[in-house]
């Protein structure tokens, strides 16, 4: 009887070690909804940014929607109804997708004519991020895409106020920061003014991106997001050649 009891204990111990753990439910694919100004938006006569270039890196069934709006501020994006559209996209996707909302503003908020103070800008960013979290999605706060204006050989930093404000909001609210300004500045400084001008939407426009520029800076965004969350590698495709050129500071 004692031997039988011992064998029973050993058998149970063996089963506890060898019985496979039940598999987790199937991982949800990612969905990215992009909120921002013309430096995120689809290429058009009035603007164009990194958004479509980034969305092109997504691997189905992952998908995204670019809701960047030319001329938008953190105020006008809400008042004009764009933010409500983004939130509706989130609501309709959260059951089937792991939803991320990119939030990048600043280019227009910093313009005096738009009457958005830095304090208000920070409050607005925090509010947008909170709205996303309340719906069970993940906000990604982006610092602004760099402009490509040079003084001689030196790239000008003319977005410092809104960039620093965005970093402060991310830190204070414990929201993931994607420091696109730092990454885009590093790359643009490395390739220089003449090469950077090849990304201009039209001659002399050193703010917006043409289609090729969207692909290159969209790749920068993809790599930054992958660095911040390696679990997304299933849904964001890689381009080793392009990523290497960017990392080396070589025009791509």
What is the meaning of each model-derived region?
Residues 25-28, 58-59, 93-97, 134, ...:
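Extracellular/periplasmic catalytic domains that process cell-envelope and extracellular macromolecules
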Residues 31-36, 40-41, 63-68, 98-105, ...:
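Structural recognition of the beta-strand scaffold that forms the well-ordered cores
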Residues 145-252:
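Catalytic His-Asp segment of secreted/periplasmic serine-dependent ester chemistry enzymes
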Residues 19-70, 84-95:
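Serine-esterase "nucleophile elbow" of acetyl-processing enzymes
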Residues 1-22:
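Fungal secretory targeting signals
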Residues 79-123, 147:
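Oxyanion-hole/transition-state-stabilizing segment in secreted/luminal serine hydrolases
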Residues 42-45, 74-77, 109-114, 118, ...:
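Extracytoplasmic/secreted cell-surface and envelope-processing proteins
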Residues 120-130, 134, 161-168:
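Alpha-helical scaffolding segments of alpha/beta enzyme cores, especially the outer helices
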């Amino acid at each position: 009887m004692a031997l039988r009891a011992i064998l029973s204990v050993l058998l149970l111990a063996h089963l506890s070690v060898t019985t496979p753990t039940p598999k987790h439910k199937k991982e949800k694919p990612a969905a990215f909804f992009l909120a921002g100004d013309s430096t995120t938006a689809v290429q058009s006569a009035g603007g164009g940014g990194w958004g479509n270039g980034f969305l092109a890196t997504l691997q189905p069934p992952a998908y995204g929607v670019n809701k960047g709006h030319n001329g938008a501020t953190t105020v006008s994006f809400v008042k004009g109804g764009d933010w409500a559209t983004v939130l509706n996209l989130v609501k309709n996707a959260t059951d089937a997708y792991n939803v991320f909302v990119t939030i990048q503003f600043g280019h227009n908020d910093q313009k005096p004519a738009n009457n958005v103070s830095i304090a208000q800008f920070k409050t607005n960013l925090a509010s947008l991020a909170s709205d996303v979290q309340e719906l069970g999605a993940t906000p990604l706060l982006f610092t602004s895409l760099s402009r490509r204006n040079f003084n001689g050989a030196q790239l000008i930093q003319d977005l410092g106020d809104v960039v620093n404000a965005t970093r402060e909001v991310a830190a204070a609210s414990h929201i993931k920061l994607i420091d696109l300004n730092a990454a885009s500045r590093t790359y643009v400084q490395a390739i220089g003014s003449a090469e950077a001008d090849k990304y201009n939407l039209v001659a002399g426009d050193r703010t917006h991106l043409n289609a090729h520029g969207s692909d290159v800076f969209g790749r920068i965004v993809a790599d930054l997001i992958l660095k911040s969350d390696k679990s997304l590698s299933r849904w964001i495709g890689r381009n080793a050649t392009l990523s290497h050129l960017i990392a080396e500071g070589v025009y791509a």
